[in-house]
């Protein structure tokens, strides 16, 4: 099931279990995963996109191996909050993904996640070549960590 509201996404999840964060691009999918208690997001890898069936098979293998219980997709909103073609493409990807990988899917505003990831990599004095290799899954880590922090806050506040 696909959820626009993070509160609904949280309600659809078991109490524990790892989540994945995806930063969907036209050529790559950055993947990050959380620990089972959903405290820390760790950038995992970048999947080079080919055909949807192949991309979905790779994501399903990761989900099975990591025993994921949910997926967060970064939703690329425009700076004014509206949704353009990239957001529509992300929503279509989610609709197709749940047909192959029947896990709860939530969306998270990904505005500036790549900028934050780039800044962190620059501060770590990462070479340009290495930044290009890891930027997508580091951005996925930022997206997922934002969700984990929000889920933690909702759990403490009883807002879910």
Curated annotation (Swiss-Prot):
It is found in: Cytoplasm. GO terms for cellular component: cytosol. Its EC number is 3.1.-.-. It is an enzyme of class 3 (hydrolase). GO terms for biological process: rRNA 5'-end processing. CDD domains: YqgF (cd16964). This is Putative pre-16S rRNA nuclease. GO terms for molecular function: nuclease activity. Could be a nuclease involved in processing of the 5'-end of pre-16S rRNA. Keywords: Cytoplasm, Hydrolase, Nuclease, Ribosome biogenesis. Belongs to the YqgF nuclease family. HAMAP family: Nuclease_YqgF. InterPro entries: RNaseH-like_sf, YqgF, YqgF/RNaseH-like_dom, YqgF/RNaseH-like_dom_sf. It comes from the Bacteria. It comes from Cereibacter sphaeroides (strain KD131 / KCTC 12085) (Rhodobacter sphaeroides).
